[in-house]
Every structure is written in C-alpha cells, then in structure tokens.
C-alpha cells in the first residue's frame, strides 16, 4: 500500500481526530525530534482506532507484521505462551510506548498484545513507516532508539530475575512504574495498578501469595500505602534503595 492509498483509507475510516501535533505523548513516541513538515507526513499515514476494550487483543503470535502500535492511553500487556500452554508476561506498556517491534525480524509477531483496560492506540503501517524513515534520518534514529530501549529493558529484566530476591524484584517494579507514570505527566506518587497481582507475579516470577505478602510488608515498613488497586509511594528513596536502583525500561 502506498502512502497516498493509506491516506485515502485513513480518511474513510472512523477514527478519533487527534493528531501527532496535539498528542501529549509525542516526546516519548515516534514523532519525537521531527519538524512540522515531517510530523505532517507521519501523521498522514497513522490510523487512529476506536477504543480497544479490556481483554481485547491488538495482535496475536503468528500474525503477519502489518503495523506498529503507539499507545495513546491505557495499558497493554505483552505475553507469550510456553510449550506447556502457560502464559508468560513479557511486559506492561503505557501511553507513549510503541509495541510490535517483535515482528520485524520474521515479519510476523512473536507475542500477544492485550488491553488491560480500555485503551487507545495509533496504528502505524510498518512498510510505509519504513519507506518514510528512508527519507527522514530523525525518524529512523527515533525508531532505532525505541528498539534499543526494548533491548535494554529485556537485558535489565534478565538481570532482575537472575540476581534479585523477591523483595527487590517487587520494589524495582513499583519504583519503575512510578517513574514511568511521572515521565508521562501523571502522578509518580499515587497510581492505579491496571494489572492483577497474578499478572505482576507472573511477570516477576513470583506467586500471587508472595506479591500480596510483600505489599503488606512494604506497607508496614512505611514504603507504600495500598488502597485496593491504588499504590501510594510514601518513601521513594527507601523503595529505590530496596530495589537496588534496578530500572526496567518498560
């Protein structure tokens, strides 16, 4: 599909009329560093989809790579299915994150992406994005930066699971989530967990019981307050010390 064909298809589609110029997540997403003309060209190929409902899948493992997806709002989890048929969560993605890079090598997705709450995404046709990036060095550089961030987060996750104990893993997860919300202009002190404790345990290699016990311990120690699904950071410094300053990029 050419850029012009996609532009016509996008115009005919029912979407949400927000543009890259107006998006508050632009500094975290693909448009970062582009000038006004380049931003217009990128904006022309993007399709804004209707809200994705909780539990709905954006893509499945084995689906051909057609697009990357920039998250405008909400939370998306990525996961794979093990040989035993069990779900293994590989990441939680927030507004400003771009997902779908896993499909570039084999031209098909290697994981699943599912909404944890009502979410909005921008669909970016990969072939046209690749064509545009050939004429826009800043765009290509930003795509490479985003891919590099994925590699770095995978490396940090391996380190977290192999070298950290249960307390350190959960502390790193909460601290990182707080920082990510803060980077997006939200409160880094108080936020809602859109993922279940089972999801968190799956991601960190811990049981649900361990997650619940540690949350209670953190609360008694004055690190956090837990109010249902809401987390309030009471002592960010001590939480970071417990985490060992593990970052986990995504």
Swiss-Prot record:
Stored InterPro entries: cNMP-bd_dom, cNMP-bd_dom_sf, Env_Response_Regulators, HTH_CRP, RmlC-like_jellyroll, Tscrpt_reg_HTH_Crp-type_CS, WH-like_DNA-bd_sf, WH_DNA-bd_sf
All residue ranges annotated as the HTH crp-type domain in the record: 164-237
Keyword annotations of the record: DNA-binding, Transcription, Transcription regulation
Gene Ontology biological process terms in this record: anaerobic respiration; regulation of DNA-templated transcription
DNA-binding region, residues: 197-216
A single cellular component GO annotation: cytosol
A GO molecular-function annotation: DNA binding
SUPFAM superfamilies assigned to the protein according to its UniProt record, in alphabetical order: cAMP-binding domain-like, Winged helix' DNA-binding domain
Function: Regulates anaerobic growth on fumarate, nitrite, Fe(3+), TMAO, DMSO, thiosulfate and sulfite, but not on nitrate nor Mn(4+).
Subunit organization: Monomer.
Miscellaneous remark of the record: Possesses 4 cysteines which may bind a metal ion (possibly iron).
The protein, known as: Electron transport regulator A
Organism: Shewanella oneidensis (strain ATCC 700550 / JCM 31522 / CIP 106686 / LMG 19005 / NCIMB 14063 / MR-1)
Designated gene of the protein: etrA
């Amino acid at each position: 599909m050419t850029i012009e064909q996609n532009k016509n298809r996008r115009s005919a589609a029912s979407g949400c009329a927000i543009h890259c110029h107006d998006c508050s997540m632009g500094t975290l997403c693909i448009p970062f560093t582009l000038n006004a003309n380049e931003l217009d060209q990128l904006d022309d190929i993007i399709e804004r989809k209707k809200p994705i409902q909780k539990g709905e899948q954006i893509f499945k493992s084995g689906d051909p790579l057609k697009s990357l997806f920039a998250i405008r709002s909400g939370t998306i989890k990525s996961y794979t299915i093990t040989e035993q048929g069990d779900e293994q969560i590989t990441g939680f993605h927030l507004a400003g994150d771009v997902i779908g890079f896993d499909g570039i090598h084999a031209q098909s997705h290697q994981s699943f992406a599912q909404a944890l709450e009502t979410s909005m995404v921008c669909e970016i046709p990969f072939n046209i994005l690749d064509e545009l990036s050939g004429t826009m060095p800043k765009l290509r550089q930003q795509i490479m930066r985003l891919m590099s961030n994925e590699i770095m987060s995978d490396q940090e996750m391996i380190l977290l699971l192999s070298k950290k104990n249960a307390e350190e893993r959960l502390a790193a997860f909460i601290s990182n989530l707080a920082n990510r919300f803060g980077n997006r202009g939200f409160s880094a002190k108080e936020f809602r967990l859109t993922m279940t404790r089972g999801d968190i345990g799956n991601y960190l290699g811990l049981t649900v019981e361990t997650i619940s016990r540690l949350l209670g311990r953190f609360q008694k120690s004055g690190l956090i307050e837990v109010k249902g699904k809401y987390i309030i950071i009471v002592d960010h410094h001590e939480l970071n010390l417990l985490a060992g300053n593990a970052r986990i990029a995504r």
